[in-house]
Amino acid sequence: MGAQLRVYKRRIRSVTATKKITKAMEMIAASRVVKAQRKVAASTPYARELTLPRLGTGSNTKHPLTTEADSPSRAAVLLLTSDRGLAGAFNSNSIKAAEQLTERLEREGRQVDTYIVGRRGLAHYNFRERKVVESFAGFTDEPTYADAKKVAAPLIEAIEKDTAEGGVDELHIVYTEFVSMMTQTAVDSRLLPLSLDEVAEESGAKDEILPLYDFEPSAEDVLDALLPRYVESRIYNALLQSAASKHAATRRAMKSATDNAGELINTLSRLANAARQAEITQEISEIVGGASALADANAGSDN
């Protein structure tokens, strides 16, 4: 019985130490998600203001990045995951959304080139021996605009190339949208070719009268410079959304782990108390039994 009590005490110490770790991770994630939320809010106006003049230009300009191919045959999919785990279903939901998008594009006759941000997504694809054109890692917790530019560069290069030279006709992105501390949703969005109606709706300019611009030297030259910045800003915003979602998911997972550890400690404490009481009861029974046997022996010797 004493050995069982020692086992319970050892498990209580182990779970208590784990609870301290998960509580600390919960607090760190809570701090990071607040910072990430602020960055998301700060990056949105930039993407919106960058888009509005593009709307006024692109609506009357034929440009490779705003014109859909007659028969698109190849698409690039950028999947955003995290470098670390301990975030519940955050990564699995994003990967599932990317796989569903890939299946849909392939059914429509497109060859899909996959680009991945985050070690978790890359590990998933490598384990299943799926081809990844290019991957990026090491910055998913706190992405910067420089990271977004690094991710966007090969994608912009691919969309500008002809498909016969290894280019793509479309660019899609899959990331986790931060809705609230309790809700994060995996979504997919087509970045290129730009859909004027979709971008207008996203930017809130659907019913807005757009200003007229006079561009020098030409609208096409402006689009050449403007659209890469647009792609970079959209990817940056998606990286920030994913970072905020990951921290929120980690906070929620660690809170659940902390609560479960507390419940397990209570259960083990009850079992330890029961084992201690049983041990005490057994000792008392042995003492009483020994005293009774001694009394019987003394009575027999007197007779």
Curated annotation (Swiss-Prot):
Any one GO MF annotation of this record:
ATP binding
- Give a yes or no for keyword Transport in this entry: yes
GO cellular component annotations of the record: plasma membrane; proton-transporting ATP synthase complex
Task: For this UniProt record, give its keywords in alphabetical order, as a comma-separated list.
Answer: ATP synthesis, Cell membrane, CF(1), Hydrogen ion transport, Ion transport, Membrane, Transport
Q: Which InterPro entries match?
A: ATP_synth_F1_ATPase_gsu, ATP_synth_F1_gsu, ATP_synth_F1_gsu_CS
SUPFAM superfamilies from the entry?
ATP synthase (F1-ATPase), gamma subunit (SSF52943)
Q: Classify the main location.
A: membrane
Name the Gene Ontology biological process terms: proton motive force-driven plasma membrane ATP synthesis
Q: Where in the cell is it found?
A: Cell membrane
Membrane topology listed for this record: Peripheral membrane protein
The answer to keyword Magnesium applying to this record is no
Function statement: Produces ATP from ADP in the presence of a proton gradient across the membrane. The gamma chain is believed to be important in regulating ATPase activity and the flow of protons through the CF(0) complex.
This protein's assembly is summarised as: F-type ATPases have 2 components, CF(1) - the catalytic core - and CF(0) - the membrane proton channel. CF(1) has five subunits: alpha(3), beta(3), gamma(1), delta(1), epsilon(1). CF(0) has three main subunits: a, b and c.
Name the family: Belongs to the ATPase gamma chain family.
> What name is this protein filed under?
ATP synthase gamma chain
